[in-house]
Amino acid sequence: MIKRISVLLLLLALSMTALFGCSQTKETKHASAIINTDKTNKEENLTPVTLNEVAHSIFYAPMYVAIEKGYFEEEGINLNLVTGFGADKTMTAVISGTADIGFMGSEASIYAYNEGANDYVVNFAQLTQRAGNFLVAREEIPDFHWTDLKDKKVLGGRKGGMPEMVFEYILRQNGIDPSKDLIIDQSIDFGSTAAAFAEGNADFTVEFEPGATNLEKEEKGYVVASLGTDSGYVPYTAFSAKKSYIEKNADVIQGFTDALQKGMDYVQKHTPKEIAEAIAPQFKETNLNTIETIVSRYYEQDTWKDNLIFEKKSFELLQDILESAGELDTRAPYDELVTTTFAEKAAK
């Protein structure tokens, strides 16, 4: 009799367990469905915006802070970030409509305008105020002068691109003729110059990060000068969109700019280490210490503005650089290619 009762109790316990487990599974699935539905509804309430960036670089830290901290979502934007690998490709994406907003050197907007584009691209937010590249030598040169480049070979950048034009601008400012006083090799792709230099090609190379830092860590090169410091304040990279897009989507552009400003504010108020930790998910192939080293280098040279306002004097300096490089026959009007409305509102 006792054995029979025990069996009945065991069967009852198993039934209750199965019933509870089934109920719990249903509740878990129901809770999961609610979470997924909430996430879907949230995404559906956001405005999709495709941003094409010229390159994916720690140089643009405030933008990545805005992404990682969720500032774009706070402003109602579901951001799709695409890397164009070159200002020409980024501009093509914006003009063709495959990207809503472009992030590139502002010289691209001047070129497009002067070529007669009807729905031309307008700059609405300036992120960086200094060049982000560095001159790397094969040996340490504690007391470097730009005249040390005379009769040397340097790995440069693409003709007509901002890295090369800023480099040549500095040379001219120091009495050096880029076409006569040294050899500038422009045959190597942007992303391959550091490797070429490490293999023994040239006496100097002009490098962005992490190329410059990696060469130093490998003891294959040494940073001897900052093009950002020696060229002065230059509107190196800015956000832009077609005139028609800005007119039709003013609220989106304002929200986008507001999100960027939050990123700018974060960078101004936090240490390089904190900034590095914030943007680390964007650079999974780079260790945190290297990211911090690079952020510190940019931080110390005052790379990032405290606002996004693209001032006229900066635009005119940019055109001076284009003219000195022989890339500009006709100056473009600031009032046509730049609007400060959104950045000014974001800064308040």
What are these regions (language model features)?
Residues 1-9:
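Bacterial N-terminal signal peptides that target proteins for export
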Residues 9-18:
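Bacterial N-terminal signal peptides
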Residues 19-31:
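Bacterial lipoprotein signal-peptidase II cleavage site
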Residues 29-177, 184-187, 196, 203-209, ...:
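Short, glycine-/small- and polar/acidic-enriched structural segments
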Residues 57, 84-88, 103, 157-162, ...:
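Soluble non-cytosolic domains of exported or imported proteins
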Residues 139, 189-283:
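Pocket-lining segment of extracytoplasmic ligand-binding domains
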Residues 247-329:
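Secondary-structure end/capping motifs
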Residues 318-348:
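Conserved C-terminal helix/tail region of periplasmic/extracytoplasmic solute-binding proteins
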